[in-house]
Design a protein with these regions (language model features):
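Generic alpha-helical transmembrane segments of integral inner-membrane proteins
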Residues: 9-16, 89, 119, 123, ...
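Alpha-helical multi-pass transmembrane bundles of energy-transducing inner-membrane proteins
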Residues: 24-26, 112-116, 120-181, 185
């Protein structure tokens, strides 16, 4: 069951290791090895998931609508696995091609952002029902807001990012309200 979360766990561990090692003034090659190792572990576990077919992860009773509980279900099936495999392959391709550009100025913070987006992108791929998709997509929107507000962009774009996030949250809440109205009818 928790095998489904292993690629996400490997990527989150890679993010933490990159953040810690980058503070120690390590060489770029060391940081690249950490990044590539995390990408390889993610790729390997997603490949293994195809053959192991772990059970879905269900968070029962996540929200109550009247007397009806709404469950969140995450996992891989024959269709979603393909998208997760494609995402892991893109990450691995980016990691391997970074080796060519190591002599250029590298910013490990950008690698952390890439890994964070892959983690946040795997959750919507794993969603097996509408409410799971809404929750996962909201998490992805939150990651995007954090990156825009963290100082990588000018203040004008920060305001635009906050407004876009507010509109997305409004859309998510409208979808949740419509879904809850459907359950009560």
């Amino acid at each position: 069951m928790l095998l489904n979360l292993l690629p996400i766990a490997f990527l989150l561990m890679t993010v933490l290791i990159l953040l810690i090692v980058s503070r120690t003034q390590a060489q770029v090659g060391t940081l690249w090895l950490v990044f590539t190792g995390g990408a390889l572990l993610c790729f390997g576990t997603i490949t293994a998931i195809r053959w192991l077919q772990p059970a879905m992860i269900t968070i029962e009773g996540w929200a109550m609508v009247g007397t009806n509980p709404i469950d969140l279900v995450f996992g891989f099936d024959d269709i979603t696995w393909v998208f997760a495999f494609a995402l892991a392959t893109l990450l691995l391709g980016a990691a391997f091609t970074l080796a060519i550009r190591l002599d250029l100025v590298q910013r490990p913070q950008e690698w952390v952002i890439e890994l964070s987006f892959i983690v946040a992108g795997l959750l919507p791929i794993m969603a097996q029902n509408l409410m799971s998709l809404v929750v996962a997509w909201t998490i992805l929107d939150f990651f995007e807001l954090l990156i825009h507000v963290s100082g990588y962009t000018p203040e004008k774009i920060n305001r635009q990012a906050v407004m876009a996030f507010a509109v997305r949250m409004g859309g998510s809440w409208l979808l949740i309200a419509a879904r809850s109205e459907e359950h009560t009818s």
